């Protein structure tokens, strides 16, 4: 993307009277030579991978070292038993972050955004929003465009 900061992209979106996600999409299309349909298809695929990582979580699976695995299920169980701090959303975010990290450690699906160390952050925030009905798939994909700007501009700040 030709924008080096979120501030620049926000200014561009405001000046064109379009959403931030639309401005990011347009910038990406101008640089990538992708069609809008293909770009959106790729975002939907990323979202589907995040969903599959959660859906296919196996609490019995362990990493090769045996150090990682099963913790997301423990968090979910503690919440169901009323032993967790925070509300439903915080418990869901915590469990989803662990599911993704454990899936990465077990070499199933790799969700690296922007690195494997932060792999669970995006799915952790987005999956509970989608499940609660607070965000539909298009809104999630728009959020992924915005998050891509943050990822791209962060190293330059």
Would you name each region that the model predicts?
Residues 1-108, 132:
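Generic N-terminal targeting/processing segments that precede catalytic cores or assembly contacts
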Residues 85, 115-119, 131:
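Glycine- and small hydrophobic-enriched segments that form the cores of compact globular domains
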Residues 107-110, 157:
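Active-site-adjacent structural elements in folded domains
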Residues 110-125:
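Conserved phosphate/anionic-ligand binding catalytic regions in large, soluble enzymes, centered on
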Residues 123-134:
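Alpha-helical support elements that line or immediately flank enzyme active sites
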Residues 136-148:
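Beta-strand segments within the central parallel beta-sheet cores of soluble alpha/beta enzyme folds
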Residues 150-156:
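Residue-level detector of conserved catalytic or cofactor/ligand-binding positions
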